[in-house]
Amino acid sequence: MSGNTFGKLFTVTTFGESHGLALGCIVDGCPPGIALDEALIQEDLDRRKPGQSRYTTQRREADKVKVLSGVFEGKSTGTPIGMLIENTDQRSKDYGNIKDQFRPAHADYTYFKKYGIRDYRGGGRSSARETAMRVAAGAVAKQVLKTLWGIEIKGYLSQLGPIAIEKVDWEQIHQNPFFCPDADKVPEMEAYMQALNKEGNSVGAKITVIASRMIPGLGEPIFDRLDADLAHALMGINAVKGVEIGAGFDAVAQKGTEHRDEITTEGFLSNHAGGVLGGISTGQDLIAHIALKPTSSLHLPGRSVDIHGNPIEVVTKGRHDPCVGIRATPIAEAMMALVVLDHALRHRGQNGHVETEFTIPG
C-alpha cells in the first residue's frame, strides 16, 4: 500500500533517506542455490555511485554494500537477502535555507501535502540516492537471470541534451564518464557539460536498456503485460518523464508495412515491437528507452512559495548532478532485470511445462 515494495514473486523492498544513517533493501523470492558474487553487486553500485567525475554530483559516497542475510558460502539460500549501504558524506547544513521552502519541480510540495511532514535534507526519501538499493537488488536479479536462462541486461546513454549518438560500440561504454557507446560524441558531450556547469544549469538525457538472449513467453496478459510492467518499473525511476518500448513514439510516423516485424523461418526481420507482442516476450531483444528531465536543483534563482504561501526566490545549495541521466544507466538496467526475473519466475511457476513444436529464432 505504501509503495516501497516492487514485484510479485521476486520482490524488493527498499528503505532509507538521502541524509539518513543508511539505505537498505530486502530481496525476497530469490531461488536457492544460485551462485551470487558480491563483487558483481559492488561493481554495479560503483558504476552508479556519485563523485566519480566532474560531470556528476561531488557528494563522495563509497556505497560499499553489506550483504546481511540470504547468502551462505557464496550461494543464495532462498531466504530474504538483506543488503545495507551506510551514508557517510551527508552535508545537511546545505539544505537549512529550504526547510520551509518548496523547490520548483521537486517533490517538496507533493511530499508535504501527502505526509504533512517532509525530510528537507537532500530530498529525503524522494532523492535518487534511494536508487542505490535498486541497483544492488538488480545486480542480484542479473546474476539469477544469467545463471538460469542466460539472459543478459545492459544499457547506455543514447542522448545527452541535444547530442544524440550515431553508433553503438559496447566496448566504449566503460571508457568514458557518460556511459556513451559513441566515442566520437564524447568530446562534444564534455564541452557541452563544461559550458552547462559554468552557466549553473542542467539538462536531460535519454537512456537505452536492452535484455539480450531473451526467452519467449514472458508476460501475464491482460493486466501484467511484460511491457506494461517494464514501463511501470522504468517510470518509477527518479526524473523519468517518458518510456518507450521498441520503436515507441516513432511508430506514429511509420506505416504498417514498415512497423510490422515480418517473420521468416530464420527469424524476425526487424524488432520495432521491442521484443514484446501482446504483452508477451517474443525471444528477441527486449528494448526500452527512457527520457529523464533536467535536474531541478539549480544555483540559478527560481520563483516559488514557502509553506505559508509567501512568494520567494529559491536558490538550491548543495551538490547536485547537472544531468541525472549520466548515472541512470545502471538504474535502468536494474529495473529491467527485476521485471524480467519476476516474470521468468512467474512463467516457470504456471507455464513451465508448456512445449510447442516450433520456436522462431530470436
From Swiss-Prot:
Its cofactor is FMNH2. The keyword Nuclease does not apply. It catalyses: 5-O-(1-carboxyvinyl)-3-phosphoshikimate = chorismate + phosphate. FMN binds at residues 125-127, 238-239, 278, 293-297, 319. InterPro entries: Chorismate_synth, Chorismate_synth_AroC_sf, Chorismate_synthase_CS. Its EC number is 4.2.3.5. Reduced FMN (FMNH(2)). Pfam families: Chorismate_synt. Keywords: Amino-acid biosynthesis, Aromatic amino acid biosynthesis, FAD, Flavoprotein, FMN, Lyase, NADP. NADP(+) binds at residues 48, 54. Belongs to the chorismate synthase family. NCBIfam families: aroC, PRK05382.1. Homotetramer. This is Chorismate synthase. It comes from Teredinibacter turnerae (strain ATCC 39867 / T7901).
